[in-house]
Amino acid sequence: MLKENWISSDLLTVNNINEILDKLYNLLYNIGIDSPIMVGVYFYDFKWIYTSDLNYIENYIVQLCNYYGIKFEKKYWDNMDGISYKDINRWCIAINLCEMDYSENKKERYVSEYNYIGDGFNI
């Protein structure tokens, strides 16, 4: 029986992992980091995930967090005992913080670039 805090392939759906990878890929792309993380990669069974894949994800989250100045404690995967909710939460929190920072900066850049006061084009 699985420990309570471990995620089985039934609990972590394809949509969950794809959403995480999709956000990560897009945020990396937005800051100019070309990553081999493929959007739409499907992990049907976590018994088949390679530890190297998990380490790639960790490394790219570290790069993203470093860019935005967000603290992220990298985990080194050397065996595949299971992915815990804590691991998924670490990824999601870090990616969401970077996404919020990116959105806020994007809005500020947009406003400062296009906010022409007096010509009827105000944001």
Predicted regions located by residue number:
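Extracellular "spike/adhesin" assembly and maturation modules
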Residues: M1-I123
